[in-house]
From Swiss-Prot:
Per-repeat ranges for Sequence: 9-85, 100-178
UniProt organism field: Picrophilus torridus (strain ATCC 700027 / DSM 9790 / JCM 10055 / NBRC 100828 / KAW 2/3)
Similarity-based family: Belongs to the TBP family.
Name assigned to this protein: TATA-box-binding protein
Alphabetized InterPro entries for the sequence: TBP, TBP_archaea, TBP_CS, TBP_dom_sf
Gene from which this protein is expressed: tbp
Function, as annotated: General factor that plays a role in the activation of archaeal genes transcribed by RNA polymerase. Binds specifically to the TATA box promoter element which lies close to the position of transcription initiation.
Pfam family, one: TBP
One GO term of the biological process aspect: DNA-templated transcription initiation
């Protein structure tokens, strides 16, 4: 089983642009169940059930998608929004570029970790560990540029990745680093 098969993607945040300008009041009427309260938040919030995602739509035409577990769900979500807006006679781009901003994933090293020893071994320039403030160790990986949160249970949360393969690279790197110093 490859490392990628043991990694669970929990959330993908992606952005796109659907137009130069959008009338959010008109969109609020077109998207049943949407939330638009401009005095509280400048964007419109719309939640989908399938795939289970949410989008934030802004007057500038920018759209953020969150909650997707895979890239297909991001694409499906944007396609659904485009389709619904076009049906409501709202002009939007047909095939906008989608940019992944962040992928959050979890991984289990299947071994309890001594975070104090790890903090000493991995070098203070890349590590933050203050157990009084937060129970996890923050490990900033330079290549790929991601942040790993390591917990005593052996669970690892990876954030900051833009592509799925970056998560796998980071997991392989941290495993090698910990094996090299005999901590797993």
């Amino acid at each position: 089983m490859s490392e990628m098969e043991k990694i669970t993607i929990e959330n993908i945040v992606a952005s796109t642009s659907l137009a130069e300008h959008l009338d959010l009041s008109k969109i609020a009427l077109a998207l049943e169940g949407s939330e638009y309260e401009p005095e509280q938040f400048p964007g419109l919030i719309y939640r989908l059930q399938e795939p289970k995602t949410a989008v934030l739509i802004f007057r500038s035409g920018k759209v953020n998608c969150t909650g997707a577990k895979n890239l297909d769900d991001v694409k499906k979500t944007i396609d659904i929004i485009i389709d619904k807006l076009k049906k409501a006679d709202i002009e939007v781009y047909d095939n906008p570029d989608i940019i992944v901003q962040n992928i959050v994933a979890v991984y289990d090293l299947e071994s309890n970790l001594n975070l104090t020893d790890i903090a000493m071994s991995l070098g203070l320039e890349n590590v933050e560990y203050e157990p009084e403030q937060f129970p996890g160790l923050v490990y900033r990986v330079e290549e790929p540029k991601v942040v790993l949160l390591l917990f005593g249970s052996g669970k690892v949360v990876c954030t900051g990745a833009k592509e799925e393969n970056e998560i796998e690279q980071a997991v392989i790197k941290v495993k090698k680093d910990l094996q090299k110093v005999g901590l797993i």
